[in-house]
UniProtKB/Swiss-Prot annotation:
Gene3D superfamilies: Clp1, DNA binding domain, P-loop containing nucleotide triphosphate hydrolases, Pre-mRNA cleavage complex subunit Clp1, C-terminal domain
Keywords: ATP-binding, mRNA processing, Nucleotide-binding, Nucleus
Protein name: Protein CLP1 homolog
UniProt organism field: Drosophila mojavensis
Molecular function via GO: ATP binding; polynucleotide 5'-hydroxyl-kinase activity
GO CC annotation: mRNA cleavage factor complex; tRNA-intron endonuclease complex
Amino acid sequence: MSEDNNNGKEYILDADSELRFEIEQKDAKVFVTLISGFAELFGTELVKKKKYEFGIGAKVAIFTYQGCVLQVTGKMDVCYISKETPMIQYINCHAALEQFRTDAEEHDKRGPVILVVGPMDVGKSTLCRILLNYAVRVGRRPLYADLDVGQGAISIPGNIATILIERPASVEEGFAKTAPLVYHFGHKSPSGNSVLYNAVVSKMAEVTLQSLDANKRTKSSGIIVNTCGWVKGYGYKHLLHAARAYRARAIFVLDQERLYNDLLRDVPSNVHVVLLPKSGGVVERTKELRHESREQRIKEYFYGNMRTPFYPFSFEVKFQDLRLYKIGAPPLPDSCMPIGMKAEDNKKKVVAVTPTSSLLHHILTLSFAESTDENVIGTNVAGFCCVTEVDMERQSVMLLSPQPRPLPPNALLLWSELQFMDNHA
């Protein structure tokens, strides 16, 4: 039910219903205020009388367990109230996880590790956000691991990352991305280098599981793992690999019964596999929208957003000062490989890259590794820069970077297929 007034429109929501809206127009802004009752956005409670702002690309679902009144101003492309919502099932999942965590706390063991899986555009990252928010609201400190290299919920696309969640996500900006643990992959899909993808997932899982033991509260809180939407063929094998690497206690499958049954067959019987419905508010994104979303994530890394703008630096680096590498050499048959090596080992080989004009717009990853003698694949990264100009005459590139010149001593840069067109005025 909705009522118009001079300050916009008031929506009266019954218990266990949600207001859904989308914003697609470029300069549109929508403001939402909780007038009365209790409501939450993906597990984060709304504060009464506080005005929340949403812009282009926002796909919002404000849920209430008890009923509420919301005031909404601004132009939305889609807006409606729905009583068909999976939130009750999601809160039941949280309750089950809390039982695991309480048991882990009492016996000083690791809390539950949960994989959230499903095809593209079924709400995997949203479910992760809900479960993480519910966990911190009851005093937990879970880890959040993001294996979705295509979109990047924690770091920029083309990488996998983990953060510690200590407080609920901001309604408008999501989780604070403080001190993330990030590993370079360099492609927007695991299919770009399946061998490398499994290697970096294994490494991050190893480090993340070890870090659980460093803090008692985090240890019992466990890990929520978001995964890619590639669930067939090699994509399915990547899911099984991730489940093994993270020693998953449970797998939440969104909206695909076939995937649910395949996992029931293929994972150990002590792993709980749970089929969950997706929200009716989940919107299927086109290829173009997914590309725009990647661009926006990279832009926010360099320039921030309306509320927290960043001011990156641009500086010149000579070719001779660039220590640039790529992970993965062209495949060779086993017969051409050195004794003891397999063709798949080439997929993890660190290869020097000669700077050319083809570097233009590519993202470069700054590794904490200082030489190729170190385990570059297993070393996390310090940050990213973007090649905004290549001057073959001057034998130099212009880099866009969050930090001023110069690059750190012994800086080792890794090539990524991800590109960013810096049109920022």
